[in-house]
């Protein structure tokens, strides 16, 4: 019972935080920041879907290396094993897509710095294209899943009717968890690359570009904060691997994996709320005076763009 309550609180918190961040991105972003707001909106939408699926399943994962048991305890149990399996797979899929979108957002930032701002239509198109492999992957697993497949397991793990097991559950879980680990590692690689790019860009700007350099520093703070998000994926995967290899017992580890994964969508919104000035001002109640003199935090908005200088609002 405590696990369900904790899971519900974490899921609800993640949904509310990401919904609020999405609201800020859609309604409080200036026109010049629209592409950036689209990137944030897509990421928060993915986090919301992850949280909803996590609440829907409320899964415990148990493994001894030879078998993997997924024990759902959420609302999905009212709809049967297939619904629980779909929710289990979608939650892992959304977690992976979230990491993929983080990598894409780093590439977009590079594109904004050195080329030009992508249109919102292009961003949505890219987001859709990135989702196609995951959709195909999920459809394949769903089509071959057999809820009636028999498997041996210890009765104390849970009710016979609400334990997902068998070869399909085993290999689909192994595949997605491995993909999560690889994708999280690629996020770290992309982070190192984009941070070096931003630092190099700031050096090249020179003293006359202090406003741009100031916002560039804010951008570095955003990605420095976001680099902690894959650490929750790493920790969850390591917990699973330790239980898989028998290094730790299942008594507590079965609850830890899903709970650890949930901290990623909970923490993610703060990278924007804390470091994007327009969103932070909404929280603190600051009202920007349009007649105030330009400062480092309020550079004048120009309709023209000098060569090599990005729009400073793209965080």
From Swiss-Prot:
Main location class: membrane
Subcellular location(s) of the protein: Membrane
Residues that span the membrane, as ranges: 6-26, 38-58, 83-103, 124-144, 174-194, 225-245, 256-276
Family of this protein: Belongs to the nematode receptor-like protein srd family.
Name this polypeptide is given: Serpentine receptor class delta-31
One Pfam family it belongs to: 7TM_GPCR_Srd
Keywords, alphabetical: Membrane, Transmembrane, Transmembrane helix
Top-level taxon of the source organism: Eukaryota
GO CC, one annotated term: membrane
Topology in the lipid bilayer: Multi-pass membrane protein
Gene from which the chain derives: srd-31
Alphabetized InterPro entries for the sequence: 7TM_GPCR_serpentine_rcpt_Srd, Nematode_rcpt-like_delta
């Amino acid at each position: 019972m405590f696990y369900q309550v904790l899971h519900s609180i974490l899921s609800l918190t993640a949904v509310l935080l990401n919904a609020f961040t999405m609201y800020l991105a859609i309604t409080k972003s200036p026109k010049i920041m629209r592409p950036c707001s689209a990137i944030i909106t897509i990421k928060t939408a993915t986090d919301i879907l992850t949280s909803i699926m996590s609440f829907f399943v409320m899964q415990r994962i148990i493994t001894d290396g030879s078998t993997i048991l997924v024990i759902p305890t959420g609302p999905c149990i009212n709809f049967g094993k297939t619904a629980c399996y779909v929710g289990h797979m979608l939650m892992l899929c959304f977690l992976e897509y979230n990491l993929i979108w983080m990598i894409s957002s780093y590439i977009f930032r590079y594109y904004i710095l050195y080329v030009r701002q992508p249109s919102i239509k292009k961003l949505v198109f890219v987001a859709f294209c990135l989702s196609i492999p995951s959709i195909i992957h999920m459809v394949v697993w769903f089509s071959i899943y057999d809820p009636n497949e028999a498997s041996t397991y210890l009765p104390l793990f849970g009710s016979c009717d609400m334990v997902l097991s068998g070869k399909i559950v085993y290999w689909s879980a192994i595949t997605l968890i491995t993909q999560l680990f690889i994708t999280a590692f690629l996020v770290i690689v992309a982070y190192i690359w984009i941070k070096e790019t931003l630092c190099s860009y700031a050096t090249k700007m020179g003293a006359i570009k202090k406003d741009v350099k100031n916002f560039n520093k804010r951008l570095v703070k955003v990605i420095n904060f976001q680099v902690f998000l894959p650490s929750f994926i790493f920790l969850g995967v390591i917990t699973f691997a330790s239980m898989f290899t028998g290094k730790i017992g299942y008594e507590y580890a079965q609850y830890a994996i899903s709970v650890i994964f949930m901290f990623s969508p909970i923490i993610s919104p703060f990278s924007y709320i804390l470091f994007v000035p327009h969103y932070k001002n909404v929280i603190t109640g600051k009202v920007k005076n349009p007649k105030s003199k330009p400062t480092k935090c309020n550079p004048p908005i120009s309709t023209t763009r000098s060569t090599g200088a990005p729009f400073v609002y793209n965080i």
